[in-house]
Amino acid sequence: MGAIIVLVVLFATIAGYFKWIHTYWRRRGISGPEGLPFIGNYYDLADVNKPRGYLIHKWTQKFGKVFGYYEGAVPVLVVSDMDMLQELFLKKFDNFYARKSTNHIHGNLECSKSEPRINLFTSRGARWKRLRALASPGFSVKALKQVHDVMEDSAINMVDLMAKHEDGKPFNIHAYFQEFTYDVISRLAMGQPNSELFNNSGVEIVKSIFMRTHRVLPWYFTVLFPQFEHLVKRMFYNHAAVQGGDIEKLLLICKKTVESRIQEREENAKLGFENAENDFIDMFLNYYSEQVEDIEFGSTVEKKVTAEDVIGACFVFLLAGFDTTANSLAYASYLLAKHPEKMKLAQEEVDTVVGSENVSYDDMTKLKYLDAVVRESLRLYPVAWFACSRECVKPTTLGDIYIDKGVKIEADVMSLHRSKEIWGENADDFVPERWLEPSSRHTMSWIPFGAGPRQCVGMRLGLSEAKTALAHLLRRYDLVAGVETEKELNILGCTTTSPEAVTLYLKPRI
């Protein structure tokens, strides 16, 4: 009897604690959606079949530009006020340098000795600053010019493989873009020597990572009790969400590649051979050290990396370089097929600017309308909204709202990108021309890659890759929407937004 009373009292105490936590925003005069007991709004937001970005957009329409919700015991503030976002991403970066985690079993995100999963995307503090400084040269204009031929070779091979669909039958063009982007990033980041479209086993592994549900028991426990995350990790050690599943498979691929390259470079050094810089692995290994001590955040960065750093970098490059660009290409192709008059304008520009079979890097900079097509596609279908989230690491204010340490902030990218206040009455329409004239729009009006110091380091690579692929595709084919083409795309994903399929027809250009 005594034990039952203790359990009842314990349950009542825990229930009371969560009831109090879930008044956090109301006590500050901020509205938001009602959640479930204990877990708050987490269940709704963890559905792979209903991307959270679209649900948050729906909530914004109901509650306004600033509202709050709960992931278990953690208050989350959603913002689509551009001045507040400028504070978040730029003016008060030191208070919000941490990105909101995509994995609730992540380990210490600021520790230099953590597992490779603590990478450029997830890391914080001094470790993030060091990794960012090391990665940035690989995405400079000079570096992009050097790797352009690799991107173009994969793009040509992709379009050649599409020739089988000249028979007038519908096909899922998104699958080709997924193969293309994985091929490119494998060659740039992992040293894959040649194009291997539709022969890369890693494609299915990466696809499954992005399509996995977040409704798993260990994650429920960690959103309920974030302070006991490490205990949860030990309790569920054998659970796939903790072991990693496909994440662990991809990390193993990266680990084998990096360790093999380290051994190769050591052997070359013994023989007196100079190590060439062929890919991102070599770029990072030029700063290789068996052990690194991160200095205090905000100080000068020491450019050194461990093997775990390089493995983590390869891992995040494979994931980020695969999904976002493939999805961007799929959305752009869908919109062009639905708007043939816009496609013709893009084709005319490509025909005029590109004078030979090759599409050079300099050609890319001249394809203004094609660039506008990609940017407009990313406006209508933002793919990486999670890059636009932060966690408060030092108490401060955002606008006139006091933000405690540990509170999470999300930008509602969809509401920004579809705002008639920003983009006019045709905000829901595909109008690439809006990008061709100088604009006085707020810097936070278009943020598909995030903003501020933590803006996606691979943004220029992704845009260049997308334009290269589209230029080669549009030179040879018309993209046609037919009876099998989706009237509305079915969007999936917990971390990024991906179309289930984009069914189009190819028509060879005469």
From Swiss-Prot:
Gene3D superfamilies the UniProt entry points to: Cytochrome P450
CDD domains given in the database record: CYP3A-like
Entry superkingdom: Eukaryota
Key words of the record: Heme, Iron, Metal-binding, Monooxygenase, Oxidoreductase
Cross-referenced InterPro entries: Cyt_P450, Cyt_P450_CS, Cyt_P450_E_grp-I, Cyt_P450_sf, Insect_CytP450_Detox
EC number: 1.14.-.-
Function field: Cytochromes P450 are a group of heme-thiolate monooxygenases. They oxidize a variety of structurally unrelated compounds, including steroids, fatty acids, and xenobiotics. May play a role in the regulation of lifespan.
Protein name: Putative cytochrome P450 cyp-13B1
Lineage per the UniProt record: Eukaryota, Metazoa, Ecdysozoa, Nematoda, Chromadorea
